Amino acid sequence: MGDPRSLALAVDGVAGVLAVEVTDLTVAYRDRPVLWDVDLSVPSGVLMAIIGPNGAGKTTMIKAILGLVRAAAGQVLIYGRPYTEQRRVVGYVPQRGTVDWDFPTTVLDVVMMGRYGELGWLRRPGKKEREAAMQALEQVGMEAFAKRQISQLSGGQQQRVFLARALVQNAGIYLMDEPF
């Protein structure tokens, strides 16, 4: 299988299609809107940051783009298609507070989780996946910690491991929620 970025663009058949397009997005918690009428257009190849005070809805917007929270209204497109059809082209680094750091897993296992989109849930990772995970750990300077439990790392080290998990996906889009 080829590069997921070229796959997504080839499927659309349109050069220059937006990487992320959000139109009239509204998200509510218990019938109380927390985001409303949000529009966002992100071209391919752009580094972009969403900044704002605590409680402004940055995390909620990322989660809505990823389908982790349900939108009350609006549309989210990734390379011109619904996110459900484009999951494999999006890498995600969550906020530290949303992860169970006491879950008994190694650094290498966490990074290999980034390969499950390509593998599927029923196939076990093999040598190729381990090599890709180790290469991603090397990119973030964490290869020496591969066999260590994720709970034994500092907060910054944990974030670098989750960055490696996103990188191992070879995604066309990376969404990072307070990555540093």
Language model feature labels by segment:
Residues 20, 34-37, 146:
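Conserved structural motif at the start of ABC-family nucleotide-binding domains
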Residues 51-53:
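The feature captures the beta-strand-to-loop junction immediately N-terminal to the Walker
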Residues 66:
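Helix-to-loop junction immediately C-terminal to a conserved catalytic motif
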Residues 74-86:
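Conserved ABC transporter NBD signature motif
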Residues 112, 127-145:
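Conserved ABC ATPase "signature" region
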Residues 149-153, 157:
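Conserved ABC ATPase signature
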Residues 174-178:
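Catalytic Walker B motif of ABC-type/P-loop ATPase nucleotide-binding domains
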